Amino acid sequence: MGLTIEPPHDHGLTTQEVEQLQKEWGLNHVAAKTIPEWKKILDRYLDWVSLIILISAIISAAVPVNGDQGWTSFVMLILELQFVVWMGYYSDRNAGDAVAELAALSAPMCHCLRNGKWGSLPVKELVPGDIIGLKGGDVIPADSKLIGEGEPLKIDESSLTGECLAVTRHPGQEILAGAVVVSGELDAMVTATGVNSFFGKTMALLAVPPERGHLQQVLNRVSIALALFAVAGCAIILGVLTGHYDNPPGYSIVTVFVIFTSVVPIGMPVVTTTVLAVGAREMAREKAIVTRLSALEEMSGMEVLASDKTGTLTLNQLSLDKEDILNWGTHTKDDVLLYSCLSAKWENNDAIDKAVTNSLGDKKYVAGYKITKFSPFNPVDKKTTAHTITPTGEKLITTKGAPQIIGDMLADPAARQACADYIAERASRGLRSLGVARSDDDGQTWSLVGLISLLDPPRPDSGETIKLAQSMGVAVKMVTGDQFAIAVETCKRLGMGSTIMEGKTVMAGLKGGDEGKPDPVLIQHCDESDGFAGVYPEHKHMIVSALQAKGRLVGMTGDGVNDAPALKKANVGIAVAGATSAAKGAADIILTREGISTIIIAIVRSRKIFRRLEMYIIYRMASSVLILGFFFFAILIFDFEIPTWILVLISMLNDASVIATSYDAVHSSDYPLHWNMTKDLAIAFSIAMVGIVGNVLLVPFVRPDLWFEWPELDTEPALKTPPDNGVSTSGKESALIFLSLSGMVQLNIILTRNPSFWWHFSKKSAPKPSPILLVPVTCFLGGSTFMSVYWNGNIKPDGQRYLFEGAGWHAVLLVWPYVFVFWVIADFFKVAISSVFVKADLIKDELKGHIDGKEKTPGWVKALDWPGETADKISDKIEACFDGMCSCFEKKEKKAKFQRTSVVSEKEGEGQVHVQVEGEKQA
């Protein structure tokens, strides 16, 4: 591609030229292969859950039952289908918009020359002909040609060519978009942008599917488990209805399909995407930009935070520690500060002079002193000297510098020894020292004023934040390239402990061979260390690997281009404020505010998100098992019937109210949270089983022919005998069972949100339910109650077979205490099972701290893990089977496409650019 405009290198393009070139070449980005909105909606209609709803609706209307067609059930199912499809669509779109908005906040920028002025510019606005400035850490934003004079660039092109060694590029040579500048500084002129660049052409050929996150795996397994459970249960129900009770095939088929529809997790995608999108926006308010939504769930389980020292735990600026000042003789500490500031530059000063002058606070304290001569620091003298006239008119010379230099100038042997001792003591702590001296006789003799030490001090909030993190079960480990002594001193000041491991020890702990796996002893040492000193980027990657090998979920912070591999390797990669483009690209979360406190806030937020997701999953499993289990036993034992439209109504109310859980008030956790499907299954099944027993036992109570006659409690006809139209269940029986079933299902939302008893609100359990949750639950419970009391039995939406009639207040007021008793019993089971798993988790966490093989896991703890592990294995096999079937055609299509376009060439000016695509690999 030839340039339409050749701009002068000292002026850059003008605004008019940029507009012309943007019209010609477009924006500098490779647009992802977006799915049209209509196809997204269509895909939702073709989703397996939607198809089940649609099939159930069609069967309800098409298959007559006792000569009647279930048009009411059909309409309700179609409405539920619309609700599921459109709520899911809008939730996904809102989540995508949230990520896009957050990504815009961290959009890559570049240094660009336009209209004769250098400034920051979004990378996507570059056009051919732009002049850009490149330095170490920058991701090259577009194909360019190096120009001007400066230090040659070392460029990492491994993402483009696979070559692991950096290459050197000089002015006049071409560089490619997507490569990373390792070192050097030069200007470049953009030659190709977007899809016209080398990288862009390759990306245009490839469609890389997004990686499936851990949360998606959990949700898939829950869906598969419930679907298999529903298929097995419904198959038996169908056999019982048609074989044992000799019901009409139409009735049996309609009933089974509606039950199946009520059991499958219809609202799961809506709830999960809403929870994550809400969480991402909450994180953005805390200056943490989420680039991968599933990272929110993974961050909740983070056990170790490997944090950079400089700029994250510390202020990244030298500071004078007033508590460490040694004042000599009759001089005070204030004298030491005053004389050190007199011999320092106040304007355009270096880091040391800035630390010294900042310690005094205000220049007014030296306003009365007149500097007649100032000798700046130089590598030979290693000191600064100021000739001064004091406010009283006396002549004074002050100096500050390397303590050994100042010590050699002193006449007093005791003062010289004090300097030597101070140097040795501070050096052992990794502190930089300065000596301060004065002369009253024009430099003939010098007397010691005192000694000061400088350090990069911890942030004011770092110590408390680290304590907070430790109280939350997150071990903060400092990672620094500074020397060992500095790391020890910083850890001591932060209250982190002093077990520091050096980077060279990390590399020495590798196994032999090509795998590069950490040694078991290294793994244990990394786990026990409080920090790491003398660390290079490759050490960070190995530290993360060692901690992960110990079974820890690791968060890693970084800011440099070479930190990208470690950020990618970590369970949660965190790019700190001021990070390079390469680090941001590899990170899951990007911080826009300095300090570790933002990370801790993000952990708190992520644990709240986990709580909401876990609550929903337990509730969804409990509700599905309760509904299926009740109908299984009620039909098997009592030939129980309920109008299908009532079952659809329960499902619709359930899906509508459960969405409110996305906004419910929850507490964070004092310890990392991990998915324990055995625990979740046990809690869900215990709640469901109590509900099943309660509802099944209620059937004979509302059937006088099976148990006893209802007393005449009101003017309504009593429930005495079953109907005589061949239906086994009367309308009032249906109403009372509907009230009991819907009541338990709705109340379980309140039950599952609290790991303790539902009424126990505390920081350790759960806060009071939010109005957003209480309002729909209360409304639906009230509506169910009024339907069970007042419904006119002559209104038969789906025909004569399906009976439903209000049973009156007296009967309803007897059912509600019954429901409440079983609900409380379920709560006790939930708490008891939770306490067992909490104890097991404590044992497993304690065993993590021991070297493998030293301690054995108790048998009962292993037994608790078996159901979940077995379910995971079965789900993995089923997922692999489905994935293989679904991707078979896609792989064939891609293979054919790559064979057709194995070599893509584009003539550009006088040369050729070749892109070789092999198999399915991305160049």
For each predicted feature, which ranges?
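Conserved beta-strand/loop elements of the cytosolic catalytic core of P-type E1-E2 ATPases, chiefly
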Residues: 83, 87-88, 115-117, 191-194, ...
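Hydrophobic alpha-helical transmembrane segments
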Residues: 75-107, 114, 210-307, 452, ...
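Cytosolic catalytic regions of ATP/NTP-dependent phosphoryl-transfer enzymes
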Residues: 298-448, 454, 467, 476-496, ...
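Non-lumenal N-terminal regulatory segments of integral membrane proteins
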Residues: 1-118, 124-127, 132-140, 145-154, ...
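Soluble-to-membrane junctions at the N-terminal ends of transmembrane alpha-helices
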Residues: 27-58, 118-119, 170, 174, ...
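Membrane-embedded transport module
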Residues: 237, 270, 276-278, 348, ...
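C-terminal transmembrane module of polytopic membrane proteins
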Residues: 699, 703-874, 878-888
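Helix-interface capping motifs at the ends of transmembrane segments in multi-pass membrane proteins
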Residues: 51, 55-76, 228-264, 277, ...
